[in-house]
UniProtKB/Swiss-Prot annotation:
<comment type="similarity">
    <text>Belongs to the Fe(2+)-trafficking protein family.</text>
</comment>
<keyword id="KW-0408">Iron</keyword>
<dbReference type="GO" id="GO:0034599">
    <property type="term" value="P:cellular response to oxidative stress"/>
</dbReference>
<dbReference type="GO" id="GO:0005506">
    <property type="term" value="F:iron ion binding"/>
</dbReference>
<dbReference type="InterPro" id="IPR036766">
    <property type="entry name" value="Fe_traffick_prot_YggX_sf"/>
</dbReference>
<dbReference type="InterPro" id="IPR007457">
    <property type="entry name" value="Fe_traffick_prot_YggX"/>
</dbReference>
<comment type="function">
    <text>Could be a mediator in iron transactions between iron acquisition and iron-requiring processes, such as synthesis and/or repair of Fe-S clusters in biosynthetic enzymes.</text>
</comment>
<protein>
    <recommendedName>
        <fullName>Probable Fe(2+)-trafficking protein</fullName>
    </recommendedName>
</protein>
<dbReference type="Pfam" id="PF04362">
    <property type="entry name" value="Iron_traffic"/>
</dbReference>
<dbReference type="GO" id="GO:0005829">
    <property type="term" value="C:cytosol"/>
</dbReference>
Amino acid sequence: MARMVHCVKLNKEAEGLDFPPLPGELGKKLWQSVSKEAWAGWLKHQTMLINENRLNMADSRARQYLLKQTEKYFFGDGADEAAGYVPPPSA
């Protein structure tokens, strides 16, 4: 049976993550209160941030930026949006 959590992003009961997605306290907090559906939404948003801002993931500043954005996305006032980003048309 799937582990259920009250998702902080979707504000509903949903299937929880199978394991903490990140190390440390933030990973534990995400595992306890974020659903698979919301995490999939974050991965899409994270990809957009990496691509549109041309982040180099070998750069520790880029990784720290994404960690802060992860926390803002789920527990704050929302993550940054890329200026001028237009989502691709739905198929």
